[in-house]
A protein has these predicted regions:
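Basic-flanked hydrophobic alpha-helices used for secretion and membrane insertion
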Residues: 1-274
């Protein structure tokens, strides 16, 4: 239904062979309100939906409703603002007191004011609905909302130069040697030379950060600063590569090549930037 994207700011919704899509995905895309979502949950508790019967209205979303959907990708500088009042200095120790250099305000926009103005982000329109062919069991597009490569690249480029990403990339501002905290707690002396990376905003504690306790102090430790920056769209490094063979012979040749590559890497002979496939 609809049309395949012709412009960078257009997107498609991918559904299953029977036009199905998960209720969670529908809710995340704003196509299923709370009342209908709860009713679907109750239907499941009561034995589910009769596959031979008529579908209940809460489980059906019309194509016309999907094709009228619009979404907005706001740049970091629109949803993250520098908190100079509570975090006047670029001192990572302030994060130990529950303060952060940036405040997330993305959820504070009025419901009807979700259109990005020039330079604020990318406005996206759903133009088509794609369905997997019966003879296919996989494809390059995943179920749900799929953006064009041009949209993703534009969004990443816009966020790479944002204030919060630049702050995260400056290790002098976003991290501290744990040994420097020994005046606060003597146990930190045992972590001399270990750098502690702090999240730039409170909501980022859920994006690549875990909570740790050192002595009497509870701090947020990043799994890795690289992952935190990626969560902010501040890294254009390729995340994954999908290879599709044209036939079974090519598939076997490809798998043999990858096995040889991994064996070569495992033997210690080398790798491509430390990457095994």
């Amino acid at each position: 239904a609809g049309a395949f994207p012709q412009n960078a700011n257009e997107a498609v919704i991918v559904v299953g062979k029977n036009n199905e899509i998960s209720d969670l995905t529908l809710a995340q895309l704003g196509l299923l309100d709370e009342k209908k979502f709860v009713q679907l949950f109750r239907n499941g508790e009561n034995g589910g939906i009769d596959p031979d019967g008529e579908l209940p209205p809460e489980s059906v979303v019309g194509f016309s409703q999907i094709l009228s959907q619009k979404y907005t990708l706001f740049y970091n500088d629109v949803v993250y603002s520098r908190d100079t009042a509570n975090y006047p200095l670029d001192d990572p120790k302030l994060s130990l007191t529950g303060k952060y250099p940036f405040v997330y305000s993305g959820g504070q926009r009025e419901k009807g004011d979700l259109t990005a103005k020039d330079g604020e982000g990318i406005n996206i329109k759903v133009t088509g609905i794609l369905r997997l062919k019966d003879e296919l069991t996989y494809g390059c597009l995943t179920s749900g909302l799929n953006l064009t490569e041009a949209t993703i690249n534009e969004y990443i480029q816009g966020n790479m130069k944002s204030q919060i990403v630049q702050w995260m990339k400056d290790s002098a501002k976003s991290s501290i040697d744990l040994g420097d905290l020994k005046d606060m707690d003597p146990t930190f002396a045992d972590y001399e030379g270990v750098r502690l990376f702090f999240p730039a905003a409170a909501n980022l504690t859920e994006k690549g950060f875990t909570q740790r306790t050192f002595g009497q102090n509870t701090v947020y430790v990043a799994i890795s600063p690289e992952e935190a920056i990626r969560a902010l769209g501040g890294d254009d490094t390729v995340n994954s590569v999908h290879i599709y063979a044209k036939d079974f012979d090519s598939k076997e040749a490809l798998l043999n090549y990858l096995d040889d590559w991994n064996a070569w890497c495992t033997s210690g002979s080398g790798s491509y930037n430390g990457i095994a496939l």
